[in-house]
């Protein structure tokens, strides 16, 4: 049996629309508090997308303390989930049809993502994906925070010997 492990952001879900919204929220508030001048660094974020959120904030806010970076991260997470739940994002064309075909053919489908669990859950529930996905795994499910290790763990847990990582 062939198994499929998909990434969520940038593979199934078009993240840019919700990212821009959430980043704008964070940097708007930083500007209001006098902690940031200039535009929201969306282009820089898009260049590093896929790294862990602590790495994101260390890159976007290098002069900020760890506590300030963590506060920005909490606000970003809240804003991102709200944007997803409000329908500001979208799946790539054909996503639901592909997942439905795979499921109908009996192929197990998993998600392995750098996203955190509540964010991934918001996408799955908002866009009706639960029917097609056997399990959603977050980078937070593995102590190392390494996505390759997460995929290896999924393969071991489900005794996967044949499949695709997309």
Where are these regions (language model features)?
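N-terminal helical cap/lid subdomain that shapes the substrate entry/recognition surface
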Residues: 2-93
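Conserved phosphate-coupling serine/threonine residues in phosphotransfer and NTP-handling enzymes
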Residues: 11, 113-115
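Hydrophobic "anchor" residues on beta-strands that sit immediately upstream
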Residues: 3-5, 110, 163-164
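Substrate-recognition "cap/lid" segment bordering the active-site pocket of phosphatases
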Residues: 116-165
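A general structural motif
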Residues: 1, 106, 160-162
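Short, acidic loop-to-helix structural element flanking the phosphoryl-transfer center
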Residues: 82-111, 121, 148-152
């Amino acid at each position: 049996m062939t198994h499929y492990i998909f990434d969520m952001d940038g593979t199934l879900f078009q993240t840019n629309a919700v990212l821009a919204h959430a980043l704008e929220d964070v940097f708007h508030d930083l500007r209001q508090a006098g902690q940031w001048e200039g535009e929201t660094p969306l282009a820089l974020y898009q260049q590093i997308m896929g790294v862990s959120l602590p790495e994101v904030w260390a890159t976007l806010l290098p002069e900020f303390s760890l506590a300030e970076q963590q506060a920005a991260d909490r606000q970003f997470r809240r804003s991102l989930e709200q944007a997803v739940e409000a329908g500001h994002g979208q799946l790539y064309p054909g996503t639901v049809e592909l997942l439905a075909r795979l499921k109908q053919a009996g192929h197990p489908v998993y998600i392995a993502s750098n996203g955190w669990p509540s964010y991934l859950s918001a996408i799955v529930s908002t866009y009706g994906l639960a029917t097609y996905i056997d399990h959603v795994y977050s980078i937070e499910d593995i102590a190392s925070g390494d996505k390759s290790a997460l995929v290896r763990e999924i393969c071991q847990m489900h005794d996967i010997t044949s499949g695709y990582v997309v």
